[in-house]
UniProtKB/Swiss-Prot annotation:
Belongs to the SNAP-25 family. Interacts with the t-SNARE SSO1 and the v-SNARE SNC2. Residues 4-50 are annotated as: Inhibitory region. Its main location: membrane. Residues 10-26 have a biased composition (Basic residues). Residues 330-392 form the t-SNARE coiled-coil homology domain. CDD domains: SNARE_SEC9N. Changing K66E: Strong decrease of the sporulation rate and loss of lipid binding. Residues 51-95 are annotated as: Positive regulatory region. It is found in: Cell membrane; Prospore membrane. This is Sporulation-specific protein 20. The inhibitory region sequesters the protein in the nucleus.
Length: 397
């Protein structure tokens, strides 16, 4: 049987009012008694929560704390299937527990093993009447050390001397936690490295697609340049056709004053060739710039770490993160360092590719805008030449 907090007042201090104790409210009473029922009568011990500074109260408080620690040791360490009986019982009269349901399969540890009858401190008979008005404040002094509760017998019976966790257990637990944390870190960095390498491969594919797209734009620009040149040639051919299609009555003798006009025509043809060459150079320059944007320096291979001098340096730097390091722990540190270094290298490659993407996107957007303008101008010129050619062919004399 165990200690039980019972409210004490002028009319409620006896063990014969258990049912009425259930209905009392704790917040309406200031003083609390902890009761233990002996063989023939009730023995009361003051609660450690009382507002008293006497030496007897402090001694009882220490006993209460030590007893509570002993109960927890028995319950948690050695007897997980045992519990203290919260009922207030005597050898003459058996009382039910205070709203504590019985649990099957659990043994009950009696506090008689801790407090034998011969060592229980009883309330002096001359002070029994004080409990009718106030809480009894002094339950007598212990005569000697043998009057203290005999929990030494219980410690020896339940072997509680060495229930504290051993230093080796603490070390093993710390080593296990460190090892599990490092394993998680290695796995996490490995997964991160895999995702980074996948992103790097995707970036390479995008670079290849941009390179193919740049080649297509180069071909389109070359065709636009040829369209401009052929448009100028068409103008010259239409002029010749108009000259040959002149009236029959027109003079056909050579004009000695046309040398200047012929010279201008030759200059026009020469300028047309220069323009063609200039357009081709611009097209090639754009293609080269595109290739230069896409020709980035990436880390083709990532070295293996943990060999020779590099291994010693890694292990020397990792000593502050290790606890009783062994070969497995050293290997985890090397793997972790290698994963982080590779992630760093791949991240640098991704950054370089991102900048290359930005430059190439801007360049290709500019090229496509120029292609659109050139095609629009060539279409307008083609419509004008068609109208002029129809006018020359349909001319009547």
């Amino acid at each position: 049987m165990g200690f039980r907090k019972i409210l004490a007042s002028k009319s409620h201090h006896s063990r014969h009012h258990n049912q009425h104790h259930k209905n009392l409210k704790l917040q309406n009473h200031r003083y609390v008694l902890i009761s233990n029922i002996t063989g023939s009568h009730e023995t009361k011990y003051l609660s450690p929560f009382r507002m008293d500074n006497c030496s007897g109260s402090r001694r009882r408080d220490r006993l209460h704390v030590k007893l509570k620690s002993l109960r927890n040791k028995i319950h948690k360490q050695l007897h997980p299937n045992c519990r203290f009986d919260d009922a207030t019982k005597t050898s003459d009269d058996k009382c039910v527990s205070y709203e504590v349901p019985e649990r099957d399969g659990l043994a009950t540890i009696s506090l008689e093993e801790v407090f034998p009858k011969s060592n229980r401190c009883q309330i002096p008979e001359e002070n029994l009447g004080e409990t009718d008005s106030v809480i009894h404040r002094d339950l007598g002094n212990f005569a000697n050390e043998n009057d203290y509760p005999q929990w030494r017998k219980v410690e020896s019976q339940y072997n509680l001397e060495n229930v504290q966790p051993e230093e080796d257990e603490i070390v093993d637990r710390l080593r296990s936690e460190i090892r599990s944390t490092k394993l998680k870190s290695v796995k996490t960095t490995s997964r991160t490295l895999e995702k980074a390498i996948e992103a790097r491969c995707t970036g390479k594919r995008v670079l290849q697609q941009l390179s193919c797209q740049s080649n297509q734009l180069t071909k389109i620009e070359s065709n636009c340049d040829m369209l401009k040149i052929q448009s100028n040639v068409a103008d010259r051919k239409i002029d010749e056709l108009a000259h040959e299609n002149r009236s029959l009555l027109a003079l056909k003798s050579p004009n000695p004053f046309r040398k200047k006009r012929e010279r201008e025509k030759r200059d026009q043809i020469y300028n047309l060739k220069l323009k063609h060459r200039h357009l081709q150079q611009e097209t090639m320059k754009r293609a080269q710039d595109s290739d230069k944007n896409l020709a980035i320096n990436l880390s083709s291979e990532y070295g293996r770490y943990g060999q020779g001098v590099e291994r010693q340096r890694i292990l020397r730097d990792a000593q502050k993160y290790q606890f009783e390091a062994d070969e497995e722990d050293n290997q985890m540190e090397i793997d972790l360092y290698g994963n982080l270094e590779q992630i760093k290298a791949v991240s640098g490659d991704l950054k370089i590719m991102a900048h290359a993407f930005g430059r190439e996107f801007e360049a290709q957007n500019t090229r496509m805008f120029d292609i659109e303008n050139n095609v629009q101008q060539a279409d307008n010129a083609l419509q004008a030449k068609r109208y002029r050619l129809e006018k020359v062919i349909g001319k009547r004399w």
